[in-house]
Design a protein with these regions (language model features):
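Interhelical loop/hinge segments that connect adjacent transmembrane helices in multipass membrane
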Residues: 1-10, 187-191, 205-248, 291-306
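Interfacial segments at transmembrane-helix termini and the short loops linking adjacent helices
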Residues: 4, 112-134, 327-359
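Helix-loop junctions and terminal segments of transmembrane helices
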Residues: 62-78, 154, 213-214, 270, ...
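Membrane-interface junctions at transmembrane-helix termini in multi-pass inner-membrane proteins
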Residues: 137-167, 188, 209, 353-384
Length: 387
């Protein structure tokens, strides 16, 4: 009976996420086309690389977010709501501290990097500065809302997650149409639009959690062990996040240093395509991950392993079905979608799709590993190999 209810819940949540995916993918791809046409290739490339600077510092958030999601879902699986409130409150405080740390480094090291290392035309440096400031604001707002997002996902309220995501992309589409008719610096205006959308998204997240989940009411506990538990777990996950940074934004920075902004534009478009196609498999991943952690918390190891195996096969198949025709007809797809696009966009897209196929096989095993809490050895190994 328990398995049937879990499978039914996963199926329902997956359906909601596919509805979200369909709407978000169509709107996002169309929005990207309008943004590229409105900003132009050079400004689009500047936006991509400048916004990427802040990512050099947010790998810390990736580690802490993973810890927050794991511990919230784990305690919810055990149905220990007192401990759940303690974990949520400690996680919120930790994310506030992290946001302040990132703000310090972003405004010091990041600003220096912007003016001294990136290849940006001198007449666009002022615009690049404001894009960077907006990227910092958007990132910090995203960091402090992580505990609320983790709580929604742990409760498996995928409908709310879907509605908020659709709201996000539709609002951006409305704003980009507005952008086309304004006589302002379009690059700067688009950066401020990102901040505005993030503020609204965070507000809705907070209101929903505060109304439906009592454990989201912040209480300040003096139990140092709570904060230590989250930070210790995050520290080992930090090693893995560092390797991801080296692969992702490190590549972006190197491309800019050795080439020019049009290459960053090509990679930025490829990353947009990756974000769209990965949703075909990640919807099932998002729906299944909370169940994997909860099953481990309850000691249902055999059921957890069955879920991991079945989910891995289905995720790879869903992604492969979509990725294969895209790879075979990449030139045609880019022509229909963008019209004019930067050189090397095809090559970047094919490489990124291949990487996504590999990741779809291992993602559930990573979730199970995080559920156990024993992540020290694996992250050290990955960090040494990739970095």
């Amino acid at each position: 009976m328990g398995n049937h209810l879990n499978n039914k819940r996963i199926a329902k949540n997956t359906l909601m996420l596919y509805i979200r995916m369909g709407v978000s993918m169509i709107v996002s791809l169309y929005t990207s086309r309008i943004v590229l046409q409105t900003l132009g290739i050079e400004d689009y490339g500047i936006y991509s690389v400048v916004a990427g600077i802040i990512s050099m510092f947010t790998f810390l958030n990736g580690a802490l977010s993973q810890a927050t999601s794991r511990f919230i879902t784990f305690e919810l699986g055990k149905k220990d709501f007192v401990q759940l409130n303690k974990i949520f409150s400690a996680a919120f405080v930790n994310h506030i501290i992290l946001a302040l740390i990132i703000l310090f480094f972003a405004e010091s090291i990041g600003t220096w990097f912007l003016y001294n290392k990136l290849v940006i035309p001198e007449y666009r440096l002022d615009a690049a500065f404001w894009v960077y400031q907006c990227s910092i604001a958007t990132t910090l707002l995203g960091i402090v809302q992580v505990p609320y997002g983790s709580l929604i996902m742990a409760h498996e309220k995928m409908g709310i997650y879907a509605y908020l995501s659709i709201f996000d992309v539709v609002l951006k589409l409305i704003l980009v149409f507005l952008l086309s008719y304004l006589s302002v610096d379009k690059l700067i205006f688009w950066a401020f639009c990102g901040v505005f959308v993030t503020i609204l998204y965070n507000t809705f997240n907070y209101i929903y959690c505060h109304k439906h989940f009592k454990e989201s009411h912040i209480s300040f506990y003096k139990e140092i062990s709570l904060y230590k538990k989250l930070f210790t777990y995050s520290f080992w996950d930090f090693i893995g996040s560092l390797s991801s940074l080296a692969q992702g934004q490190g590549q972006n920075m190197m491309l800019n240093i050795f080439f020019d902004p049009t290459i960053n534009a090509a990679r930025g478009i490829a990353m947009t395509i990756q974000g769209a196609i990965v949703q075909f498999s990640s919807n099932f991943t998002i729906a299944s991950n909370p169940q994997i952690t909860k099953l481990y918390a309850n000691g249902n190891i055999k059921e957890m392993m069955n879920l991991i195996y079945n989910s891995s096969c289905l995720s790879f198949f869903l992604l492969y079905v979509f990725a294969l025709p895209l790879c075979l007809e990449i030139d045609y797809v880019l022509q229909i979608w963008l019209g004019t696009y930067p050189d090397y966009t095809q090559i970047f897209t094919l490489l990124i799709i291949t990487n996504s196929l590999i990741w779809s096989i291992k993602s559930y095993r990573v979730t199970a590993l995080h559920a156990t809490g024993h992540i020290k050895l694996s992250n050290l190994t990955v960090g040494v190999i990739l970095c």
